[in-house]
Swiss-Prot record:
PANTHER family: LOW MOLECULAR WEIGHT PHOSPHOTYROSINE PROTEIN PHOSPHATASE, LOW MOLECULAR WEIGHT PROTEIN TYROSINE PHOSPHATASE. InterPro entries: LMW_PTPase, Ptyr_pPase, Ptyr_pPase_sf, Tyr_phospatase_low_mol_wt. Its EC number is 3.1.3.48. Dephosphorylates the phosphotyrosine-containing proteins. The lineage of its organism: Bacteria, Bacillati, Bacillota, Bacilli, Bacillales. The gene is ptpA. GO terms for molecular function: protein tyrosine phosphatase activity. It comes from Staphylococcus saprophyticus subsp. saprophyticus (strain ATCC 15305 / DSM 20229 / NCIMB 8711 / NCTC 7292 / S-41). This is Low molecular weight protein-tyrosine-phosphatase PtpA. Keywords: Hydrolase, Protein phosphatase. The active site is at C8 (nucleophile), R14, D120 (proton donor).
Length: 154
């Protein structure tokens, strides 16, 4: 089983949105060999469900997020692919786990966009814009993982 963790600051806006979108895309493509989760590098929102803005945009697009709660990225976490939402979180991940084993990327490395960081809608309130960024990046990420991990689509 290949493991993927999306990481943002509080694990209530961007990374749970990416987790839910990725899960739906994997389900739609009948890919069962990839397990997806999300984490935060900050402790403020531990145990909380996704932000109401994230819930609203996911509901609008019929993407389930049932049972999701904020979890902390920890030094002993072991994922094959760690997908950070911005450079600040890349830096935080490296500080939390300097000997990280999994491959670390920023989500927008899998996008055709010129932006390099997914802005935090907690501050911008632009949940629709973040949804579009995440949505457009996840298919490319899935294709990369399939090729990189030598998986097959069923």
């Amino acid at each position: 089983m290949i493991t993927v963790a999306f990481v943002c600051l509080g694990n209530i806006c961007r990374s749970p949105m990416a987790e839910a979108i990725m899960r739906q895309k994997l389900l739609d493509r009948n890919i069962n060999d990839i397990k997806v989760t999300s984490r935060g590098t900050g402790q403020w929102n531990l145990g909380e469900p996704p932000h109401e803005g994230t819930q609203a945009i996911l509901s609008e697009h019929d993407i389930p997020f049932d049972g999701m709660i904020s979890e902390l990225f920890e030094s002993n976490d072991d994922f094959d692919y760690i997908i950070a939402m911005d450079q600040s979180n890349v830096d935080n991940i490296k500080q939390i786990n300097p000997n990280i084993k999994g491959q670390l990327f920023k989500l927008l490395e899998f996008s055709d966009m010129t932006e390099t960081d997914v802005p935090d809608p907690y501050y911008t309130n632009n949940f629709e814009g973040v949804y579009k960024m995440v949505q457009s990046s996840c298919d490319n990420l899935i294709n990369f993982i399939i090729k990189d991990a030598n998986l097959r689509e069923e």
